[in-house]
Amino acid sequence: ILGPNGFEWLPFSDFIVSYPGILIAFIFASLPFSSKDFVLKTGGRRAGEIGTYSSIAVLWQWGLGTLFALAVLSFIWPELHPGFGTLLAAGFVGGHGTAAAIGSTFMDRGWDEAQSLAMISATVGILCSIVGGMLWIRWGSQKGVTNFITPFKDLPDELRTGLIPENKRESVGSETVSPLAIDPIIFHFAIIASAAVIGYYIGIWSSDLMSDYRIPTFSLAFLVAILLKWGLKTFRGYQYIDQKISLRLCGSFTDLLVVFGITSIQIPLLIKYAFPLFGLFIVGILICWALFFYLGPIVFRENWFEKSLYTWGWVTGIMAIAIALLRIVDAKNKANILSDFAVAYFAIGPLEVLLVTLAPVLIMNGYQWGFSIVTLGAGILLLLIILFLKMRMAAECNPQDPGKPHQITDIRSE
């Protein structure tokens, strides 16, 4: 509110919008040093679950958003551009970066309002992410479906106030190197920063090889950190890495990311347009609600609420909000969701890039109906495959009663 996009009392840098992207790389680079080792058998399955769930969310936003705009909104507002429905996915699941990419592409092809509309979509998406996420947390804590928090009234004072009594305080870490040589916190920061910087330059190199695609920096930073951790273990240097210090650095990066992510919101864009964006946003919220409430408990074998909440955060807003919501329900990263998502994003990322690249080209060439139907159809097909595999797995695990309903049915009926 007090920043450059509000009352302009706090003179932040003009580059503040780029800070969240930088901090995300540091967060993911710190994960291998602050969490348990990724086990391929169980970790691969978890990454596959969250990757499939996220892919369905991406495909449904692109497909249903475009189809709704073509089939419904265009009858009410005939002057709407055929690509209007893509603004939902561009802003919600894409964020401001994708919104800028989609908007500029459409502008180059004659749709002058695309850039402003896409940025509004991204801004509204962030608000939906925050408000909706907090409502989900309240609902989850009341229903008892959260695994790492309890109803607010039953929480201890330190969790309700944020202030820890002296008799409950824990050490934030141990000195693994002498402060006379280098401060332990700076030492750990340097290790994490090295992985993030190397990942950044690998991303630049990948964009030179593939001119239309750049591997996300945060995924590369995570991969480099895993390799760095393996190297340190191989040469017996990992004994000087303290997991608690790494975790605290990860938490610090997350707090900064949330601050700069919210500060970079451009408030004037929220009041510039109203209709027919309102109808498009309602459809987007309903899509994400259905995915959270119905599909999440089916797809995820464990920690379904935390994983669905994290996905809600980034498919409606930005990664910063997703991490902030996850920090509320899983402050100590016990579910290892960020690690799983970093692996899964190697499949989600190319899908997003493919859609962002093809959507404007196909729509501007008159294939808007075909694009929406094929995209939505792919999402439905992926859903049917998941449902089939889950039903088959349930039948194998419970042959006496293969049709037993999922346990979440009782929660929804309360």
PLM region spans:
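Flexible hinge motifs at transmembrane-helix junctions and intramembrane kinks/re-entrant loops
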Residues: G6, S18, A71, Y200-K244
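Intrinsically disordered, low-complexity non-transmembrane regions of multi-pass membrane transporters
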Residues: W139-I186, K233-Q239, M391-E414
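Structural signature of hydrophobic alpha-helical transmembrane segments
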Residues: S13-F28, P82-A89, D212-V224, L249, ...
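C-terminal transmembrane helix pair
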Residues: F260, I267, F281-R392
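Entry/N-cap segments of selected transmembrane alpha helices
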Residues: P20, D37-L70, F189, R248, ...
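Alpha-helical membrane segments and immediately flanking helix-loop junctions
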Residues: F68, W77-E113, L117, W136, ...
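Hydrophobic transmembrane alpha-helices of secondary-active transporters
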Residues: I1-N5, S13-R45, L223-L232, R248-I271, ...
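Juxtamembrane helix-boundary/capping and inter-helix hinge elements in multi-pass membrane proteins
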Residues: S34-G48, L73-P82, S104-S116, S141-T150, ...
